[in-house]
A protein has these predicted regions:
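Generic detector of well-ordered alpha-helical packing
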Residues: 4, 16, 55-56
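PLP-dependent aminotransferase class I/II
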Residues: 22-192
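Conserved active-site segment immediately N-terminal to the catalytic lysine
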Residues: 1-12, 40-45
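Adenylate-forming
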Residues: 12-16, 61
Length: 192
C-alpha cells in the first residue's frame, strides 16, 4: 500500500493512495473494497467504502511523479547536511550512520531526531520560526483501539515517544533555510 497523503514525498492535493500486488484475486478484492464493496454494478458482496482516487488527484500525481527522484535527492542532501553539521550532543539521529555509509536508502518523508529535552527544543525552534512536529503524539500501544496493550511496559517505545521531534526536511527548502535550522539547533546547546 502506498500513501499519497499531501505531506508525503509524492503527495496528492487530498487523501489518495494505491495498492500494488501481483495477486489477481487480491487485486480484485481490493478494487471491490475500495468501490463500496462492489465488484460489479449494484452488487455488493463485501462491506466496503469509497476509496477510489479521483481523476484530479491522479493527474496531479502523474505530474509530480516526474519530479520525485529529484525531490528525494534534495531531501537526502538536506538530511546529509543535518547529520554532518548538527553538532548539538543533545540531538541524536537514529540510524544516521547506516544511511551515511550507504548501507540503506532513505527518502526522508520526515527527519526525526531524538532529544531528551524535546519539548524545550520544540518551543525554542518555534520561537525561531522553525516548524516542527511530533510523529506521533500517542504511541501505538496507548491508542484507544488497543486497550489490551495499555498496561504493556515498552520502555524503548516510550522513550522514543518522549524524545522524538521531526525537523523540517522538504525539497522546497533553500540552503539558507537548512543552515538556519542547523544553527538554531546547535545554538540550543548553549541555551538549554
Amino acid at each position: 500500500a502506498h500513501s499519497f497523503y499531501p505531506g508525503k514525498n509524492l503527495g496528492a492535493l487530498g487523501d489518495a493512495g494505491a495498492i500494488t500486488t501481483d495477486d489477481a484475486s487480491l487485486a480484485d478484492l481490493c478494487r471491490a473494497l475500495g468501490n463500496y464493496g462492489s465488484s460489479r454494478k449494484y452488487v455488493f458482496p463485501y462491506k466496503g467504502r469509497n476509496s477510489r482516487m479521483d481523476e484530479i488527484q491522479a493527474a496531479v500525481l502523474s505530474v509530480k511523479l516526474r519530479y520525485l527522484d529529484a525531490d528525494n535527492r534534495r531531501r537526502r542532501q538536506i538530511a546529509t547536511y543535518y547529520a554532518q553539521h548538527i553538532s548539538n550532543p543533545k540531538v541524536m539521529f537514529p540510524g544516521a550512520e547506516a544511511w551515511l555509509r550507504g548501507d540503506v536508502d532513505h527518502v526522508f518523508h520526515i527527519f526525526p531526531v531524538l532529544c531528551a529535552c524535546r519539548n524545550e527544543l520544540q518551543e525554542y525552534l518555534k520561537q525561531k520560526g522553525i516548524g516542527t512536529m511530533i510523529h506521533y503524539p500517542i504511541p501505538p500501544h496507548q491508542q484507544d483501539c488497543y486497550p489490551e496493550w495499555h498496561t504493556l511496559s515498552l520502555p524503548i517505545t516510550e522513550r522514543i515517544h518522549r524524545e522524538e521531534l521531526s525537523i523540517p526536511c522538504n525539497q522546497t527548502m533553500t540552503d539558507e533555510e537548512v543552515r538556519y535550522v542547523v544553527e538554531a539547533i546547535n545554538f540550543f546547546l548553549m541555551t538549554a
